[in-house]
Regions:
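A glycine-/small-polar-enriched, mobile loop at the entrance of the PLP active site in fold-type I
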Residues: 48-51, 66-84
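Conserved N-terminal alpha-helix of the aminotransferase class I/II PLP-enzyme fold
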Residues: 75-108
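PLP-dependent class I/II
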Residues: 1-15, 19-25, 30-33, 37-44, ...
Length: 417
């Protein structure tokens, strides 16, 4: 009798509150919608996902094959193979003049896991994370899962999508625990220069309780100058986490391997956390990553050169397009135009109104998949990936131009004013 199940008047809800309140990634949602339309026979040009369209360099593939033949088929240390972590230590010293130990390096299943490891290891409920906008789409969800609060610092196309040191200082409160940003930036392509990082560092040195998390996954896709990092600023190396990975610079998105270099206390906490989630990363991917870090960089440079050419092509193809305000990106492989002057245009009987409706308009009328800037903390913008062929870029931009021109012809709104 006592084992009888209790009666429920409503259907059971198995999803946790944590997940129920979490928003789906808009980039992945648009990519899925684009694929579904393609499967239905529509000719969609998908500019929604940030994934290099190049093959993984041959020497990296060969290293993976050799690892299989050498039977690298066992569990690895949670933090990654020792020689791989030492390769990162060498890279940090050579590229950033930053001396770290192998114990400060942790490899994870993609830079995304590296980031969530750090946030979950450091943040407590109610902590505040300073988030310069635009920001990568997953940052806010990660902060939410860590039960912290995102404090968004807006920027504009006029500022090159960068925030000033004054804006940074004004946002700091006694609850501020972390500053999280990417450079080169996804989605804007903005690259923080040494003097800009120095200005931020001057503010942060007044607030020693703030940890800096620098997402440098686009390190190798930079069109001008050398790579700069917060760890190069005086007084910041011991309170900065650098997150990087193999996906973007080596065309290894499917290999799922990223890493964090952190203060020892943070790195140790991340190892403890990861040990309860995924344990170690793929052994074969780690051997491939070692070849990537120690091998020649000419394939990476070739990819970067191609992305620069594609950027120039996309900018040229959208030149003088009414209502299209797009700073020239200095890195990554995206355009991030402000398209807010189109919000008043009438489509399907009502104003476009917001960036999400603009992406719907472009998908339906131009058959081009883009992502709303709402997902990146910039609701007046849309993001377009240029990680595709020159022919696709030309065709996509031609379709976008034609769709907007047709919209102009059906509206009394003067977009050129």
């Amino acid at each position: 009798m006592h084992n009888q199940p209790l009666p429920f008047t409503e259907p059971l809800q198995w999803t946790s509150k944590r997940v129920a309140e979490l928003e789906e990634s808009q980039t992945l949602a648009m990519a899925a919608r684009s694929r579904a339309l393609t499967e239905q026979g529509f000719e969609i040009i998908n500019l929604s996902l940030g994934e290099p369209d190049f093959d993984t360099p041959a020497h990296i593939q060969e290293a993976a094959c050799q690892a299989i033949h050498d039977n690298y088929s066992r569990y690895t240390p949670v933090a990654g193979y020792a020689d791989l972590r030492k390769a990162v230590v060498h890279k940090m010293e050579q590229v950033l003049q930053w001396k770290v130990s192998p114990e400060q390096v942790l490899f994870s299943t993609g830079a995304k896991q590296s980031l969530i490891n750090v946030l979950m290891a450091v943040l407590n409920p109610g902590d505040e994370v300073l988030l310069p906008a635009p920001y990568w789409v997953s940052y806010t969800g990660m902060i939410q899962m860590a039960e912290a609060k995102a404090v968004v610092l807006p920027s504009s196309a006029e500022s090159g999508y960068k925030i000033s040191a004054e804006a940074l200082e004004a946002a700091i409160t006694p609850r501020t625990r972390m500053l999280l940003y990417s450079s080169p930036c996804n989605p804007s392509g903005a690259v923080l220069q040494k003097e800009e990082l120095e200005a931020w560092a001057a503010v942060l040195r007044k607030h020693p309780g703030i940890l800096v998390v620098s997402d440098e996954i686009y390190e190798h896709i930079r069109f001008e100058g050398s790579h700069c990092s917060m760890v190069q600023c005086p007084g910041m190396a011991d309170r900065t986490v650098v997150v990087n990975g193999m996906s973007k610079g080596f065309a290894m998105t499917g290999w799922r391997l990223g890493y964090a270099v952190a203060p020892l206390e943070v790195a140790t906490a991340c190892v403890k956390l990861q040990g309860q989630f995924t344990s170690a990363t793929c052994s074969i991917a780690q051997r491939a990553a070692l070849a990537a870090l120690q091998g020649p960089m000419h394939d990476t440079q070739r990819m970067c050169d191609a992305f620069r050419d594609r950027r120039d092509l996309a900018i040229a193809e959208t030149a003088n397009l009414p209502g299209w305000d797009c700073p020239v990106p200095d890195g990554a492989f995206y355009l991030f135009p402000n398209i807010s002057s189109w919000f008043g245009a009438i489509w399907q009987g009502k104003p476009l109104g917001n960036a999400e409706r603009v992406t719907e308009f472009l998908l339906e009328e131009a058959r081009v998949a883009t992502v709303s800037g709402d997902a990146f903390g910039a609701p007046e913008c849309i993001r377009l990936s240029i990680a595709c062929s020159d022919a696709q870029i030309k065709e996509a931009m031609a379709r976008i131009r034609q769709a907007f021109q047709q919209l102009i012809s059906h509206n009394s709104l003067d977009q050129g004013s």
